[in-house]
Each structure stands twice: as C-alpha cells, then as structure tokens.
C-alpha cells in the first residue's frame, strides 16, 4: 500500500516544480527511471528482451 500511495502522490502537481520526480509507470519504482520510456531500468530490460518496445535493439559495435 505504501508504494500505491507514493504513486498517487507523484501524480499530483507539486507546489514547486523542483519537487516533481519520475516514477516507473509499470511498477512504481522511483530510482533509475528513463524519462523517454517512463520505465525503470528493470522493466525496460524485461520489455526489450520480449521485443515489446519498438525500435529498441541490442547494442553491437
């Protein structure tokens, strides 16, 4: 329940802009969230391995 409350709290518009922070839209994790996808590194990796993120490929150089 604590995570659910924090997710709802993050959705509200903060009194000051600097208080806004990103959360993973899938699991609610607050750390290491990629803004472009709105996902944390763990969810991003899982979805990329399944091929559910269009345009994402494994790097090779």
From Swiss-Prot:
Cofactor: Zn(2+)
Annotated keywords: Metal-binding, Ribonucleoprotein, Ribosomal protein, RNA-binding, rRNA-binding, Zinc
GO MF, one example: zinc ion binding
Residues bound to Zn(2+): 24, 27, 40, 43
Gene Ontology biological process: translation
UniProt cross-references to Pfam families, sorted A to Z: Ribosomal_S14
Keyword Protease: no
Cofactor note: Binds 1 zinc ion per subunit.
Matching InterPro entries: Ribosomal_uS14, Ribosomal_uS14_bact, Ribosomal_uS14_CS, Ribosomal_uS14_sf
Domain of life: Bacteria
Gene3D superfamilies per record: 30s Ribosomal Protein S14, Chain N
One GO cellular component term noted in the UniProt record for this chain: small ribosomal subunit
Family, similarity comment: Belongs to the universal ribosomal protein uS14 family. Zinc-binding uS14 subfamily.
NCBIfam families membership: PRK08061.1
Biological function: Required for the assembly of 30S particles and may also be responsible for determining the conformation of the 16S rRNA at the A site. Binds 16S rRNA in center of the 30S subunit head.
Subunit structure: Part of the 30S ribosomal subunit. Forms a tight complex with proteins S3 and S10, which cover it.
Protein name from the UniProt record: Small ribosomal subunit protein uS14
Taxonomic path: Bacteria, Thermotogati, Deinococcota, Deinococci, Thermales
